[in-house]
Amino acid sequence: MNPEAFQAGFACWLTSLRQLAEQRCDADQPVFNVDGKTHRRSHDRKNSLGALHSVSVWASDYALSLGMVATEEKSNEITAIPELLRLVDIKVSIITIDAMGTQKAIAKQIVDAQADYVLALKGNQGTLHDAVVSHIEDAIETDFAGTGARRHTTEETGHGREETRTYVQLPVPADLAGRSVCSGLKTIGVVISLINRGGQESSDARYYISSLGMGVKRFARAIRRHWSIENTCHWSLDMTWREDESRIRTNVLRENTGWLNRFSLSLLKQDPGKESIAMKRRHCAWNEDFLTQVPIGHAV
């Protein structure tokens, strides 16, 4: 079956799950993460078929995969993201995308859909990236005096390391070069990470643009939530579904299987039990009562 039609068949089901998740979640503005993933062993060299690369939307507050679009390679994410955003109701949400998706047309599409964005900046954004970095570095020299900046700091310990993150959000200066590139641009920001691993210290700075107004905790939450698609969704697909090991090489079948993997993960994530996703999959095989409750998002 055509992958787009196949996903459309799940629309009502997914809407029902999303409504239930919204009732359980107290987030006023849910964060939707957009990111790509390569299905590493889905290539077929004999027939000159490259590995499948997919782009999906993960609602981190709801633990739901809301849609997926396949591309031939990672470089095609720029064209896949607009198509994906058209498939999903993103109204009132905060959309987070890495630097590849920081494009004028994508920012406009998000704002036109009555959503907000937090988009990563890297060197490929040229003038805008350089202007944001320069403005923030100059502001750091004066400890952000007179910039209207707001800060929020978090500390985490685990996996043999200590990490302190400082989130800084600033209003967009009127003279910022390249500011007209992105519709609705209101704030810029940086996350400065200081990491201590066994006495070895390192630091990192990541820059962002956003249509959000000032509110540094909301800004920080959106950035932190973006990692959920990698740490929760993609990790489970690789470790539990073994997606990277799949040798399905038929175009339509591998796309539809990719969506089924994401949808079944979403179903299991709705169960409030403390067991791992792998154990919940086993419960579906062992316990018919559990199995019949999972599809409606009411597993107990």
Enumerate the language-model features and the residues they cover:
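Generic secondary-structure signature for well-ordered alpha-helical cores
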Residues: 3, 86, 115, 137, ...
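Charged, often Cys/His-bearing segments associated with DNA-binding zinc-finger transcription factors
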Residues: 4, 8, 12, 179-188, ...
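A short, flexible helix-boundary coil/loop motif
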Residues: 145, 236-300
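Short, surface-exposed basic-aromatic patches at helix termini and helix-loop junctions that form
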Residues: 107-115
